[in-house]
Amino acid sequence: MKITSISVQQKNKERYNIFIDEKYNFSVDEEVLARYQLMKGKALTEAEIEEIKQADMVRKGLNKAINFLSHRVRSEKEIRDYLKKQEMEAFAIDEILKKLADMDYINDLEFAELYTKTQIKTTLKGPRTIERELVEKGLTREIISQVIEEYSDEAQLENATKQAIKIMKRNNKSAKKMLQQKIITDLIQKGYTSELAKTAATEATSEIDIADEADILQKQVEKTMRKNKRYKPSIAKQKTITSLMQKGFSYDTIQSYLTENEISFEEEE
């Protein structure tokens, strides 16, 4: 079998169409063309053609991977998953990853360090959430343990407290006790330890005093009573107390407030 013609592709000037015995057979990257010294009149065996095709697949995948990396740093697993989606064969993926490593395009430790620093500075995620994300990106436990140490206790508390203040602003109609519990629960879900979550909750709610809580209770009593006034007095009272307790106010606090303010649920005559 001989190469009878070589032509440049119209849409990609760096790729060439190879014709064997007057018929199109395959296309190659410019680098592969030069490496295998492909030219008109050169004889090729089937085995050589297959080798060239495989080399071109690697070259094509390498170009795709480098372009993929141009947007941001990636872990080895992210690149492998990307190449699989590009329908690259296993042998090609392994060779591409080796070439990328040799070219210093892949370094999971550097990736993990950069990713962790970015998450600490730009998000309010807890360390456990960052650890989980690194696992999903294919990082080893050894690397994860090494880089997560960069998330100091001080930085964790600072971020957790910022997150706690956000949670507090969204739930400012609840009693202090329930608000703290809500903050703790949310912070644990965001990857912080229960101990640090409790500290952040205390810090965020430290300025809420008895007067503030009394004001919140007053507003909630008025709102809940308006909502329940269509019920019979006994039912309205029960529903009001239940609703207030669900917002974190204790039964004794509610009863004291109702008594001190002479609030009655009797029907008006």
Swiss-Prot record:
Source organism phylogeny:
Bacteria, Bacillati, Bacillota, Bacilli, Bacillales
Which keywords does this Swiss-Prot/TrEMBL entry list?
Answer: Cytoplasm
Location in the cell reads:
Cytoplasm
Biological source species: Listeria monocytogenes serotype 4a (strain HCC23)
- Specify whether Metal-binding is a keyword of the entry: no
Q: Which InterPro entries match?
A: RecX_HTH_1st, RecX_HTH_2nd, RecX_HTH_3rd, Regulatory_RecX, WH-like_DNA-bd_sf
Q: Which Pfam families match?
A: RecX_HTH1, RecX_HTH2, RecX_HTH3
Q: What is its main location?
A: cytoplasm
Tell me the protein family, please: Belongs to the RecX family.
Cite a single GO BP annotation: regulation of DNA repair
Function statement: Modulates RecA activity.
Question: Which protein are we looking at?
Answer: Regulatory protein RecX
Q: A cellular component term (GO) from this record?
A: cytoplasm
